[in-house]
């Protein structure tokens, strides 16, 4: 057994020595630059490239829809204005108003249905099931919900990919994929803060009123453009707006250890972090109407 181990060890040492020797005497590799001659010398990678963006203003009326909302969905009407410094870089802003069109979810309808039944059965709020929600549910749950009133977002846009899309092997459209990011200023309506005292109650007629404020958050996302003709395109865009707010008007934090339990009042601690998502459809108009073409 010992003899066998010695033979195996000698073979391994020999293999390692051979490998080191090959590495030591390997000649260095050298690369040679290929110099093009003739008509291709100094030519660009693509000729007659349509510069859909360079030097043009982009005016894009748009409609946006919030996604994955708990209590109500918001339809935002607005648009985007960009100036394209190059075909791959632009700066501008997106803005929209969302206070006009809001649609409650089925969850909101169910909560209000149970809330109305309990209030009708016990108008004086003496039952235990009413006392537990006295500070969280007003007479009309829909009126205490948080909502996005408006958004203004200056942003920088980068366009790393572009190409063509073929439809039914007969229709060809220029397309591009872009990414954007920047700060967003968001106007919000939320249930106003209350101290839960006699002078500032969190229940009763005045305890469920709303107030407005402005939040500042990052915004980022990506989009696709499908160019219809020389001066217009159809755009689809996904946007993230992460910030903290009280969407349901509930008392969820502020008391107990680390303020993770209800405290029978409405404060800034009750605002929960939400990754708000928006889907936008736009019709893009480019000025001047004629695009440039590369050499």
Spans of model-derived segments:
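Residues that define the transmembrane beta-barrel architecture of outer-membrane proteins
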Residues: 55, 73-77, 148-152, 175, ...
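Gram-negative (and chloroplast) outer-membrane scaffold detector with strong preference
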Residues: 89-194
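Residues on the lipid-exposed face of transmembrane beta-strands in outer-membrane beta-barrel proteins
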Residues: 61-63, 79-83, 93, 154-158, ...
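Outer-membrane beta-barrel translocator domains and adjoining extracellular loop/strand segments
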Residues: 72-76, 104-109, 168-171, 190-205, ...
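Extracellular loop and loop/strand-boundary signature of outer-membrane beta-barrel proteins
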Residues: 46, 65-67, 139-143, 166, ...
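Outer-membrane beta-barrel "beta-signal"
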Residues: 154-157, 273-295
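Repeated loop/turn-to-beta-strand initiation elements of outer-membrane beta-barrel proteins
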Residues: 57, 88-91, 164, 230-234, ...
């Amino acid at each position: 057994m010992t003899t066998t181990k010695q033979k195996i060890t000698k073979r391994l040492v020999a293999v390692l020595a051979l490998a080191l020797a090959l590495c030591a005497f390997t000649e260095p590799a050298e690369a040679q630059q290929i110099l093009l001659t003739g008509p291709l010398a100094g030519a660009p990678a693509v000729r007659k490239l349509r510069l859909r963006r360079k030097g043009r203003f982009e005016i894009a009326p748009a409609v946006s829809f919030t996604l994955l909302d708990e209590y109500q969905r918001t339809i935002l009407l607005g648009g985007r204005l960009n100036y394209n410094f190059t075909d791959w870089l632009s700066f501008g802003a997106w803005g929209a108003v969302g206070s006009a069109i809001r649609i409650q979810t089925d969850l909101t309808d169910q909560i209000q249905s149970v809330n109305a039944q309990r209030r009708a059965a016990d108008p004086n709020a003496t039952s235990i099931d009413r006392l537990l929600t006295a500070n969280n549910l007003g007479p009309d749950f829909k009126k205490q919900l948080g909502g996005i009133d408006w958004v203004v977002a200056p942003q920088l846009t980068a366009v790393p990919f572009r190409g063509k899309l073929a439809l039914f092997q007969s229709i060809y459209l220029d397309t591009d994929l872009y990414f954007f990011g920047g700060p967003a200023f968001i106007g919000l309506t939320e249930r106003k803060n209350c101290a839960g005292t006699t002078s500032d109650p969190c229940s009763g007629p005045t305890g469920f009123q709303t107030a407005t404020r402005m939040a500042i958050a990052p915004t980022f996302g990506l989009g696709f453009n499908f160019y219809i003709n020389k001066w217009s395109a159809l755009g689809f865009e996904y946007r993230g707006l992460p910030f903290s707010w009280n969407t349901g008007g509930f008392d969820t934090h502020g008391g107990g250890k680390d303020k993770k339990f209800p405290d029978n009042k409405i404060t800034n601690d009750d605002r929960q972090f939400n990754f708000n998502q928006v889907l936008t459809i736009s019709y893009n108009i480019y000025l001047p109407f004629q695009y440039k073409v590369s050499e």
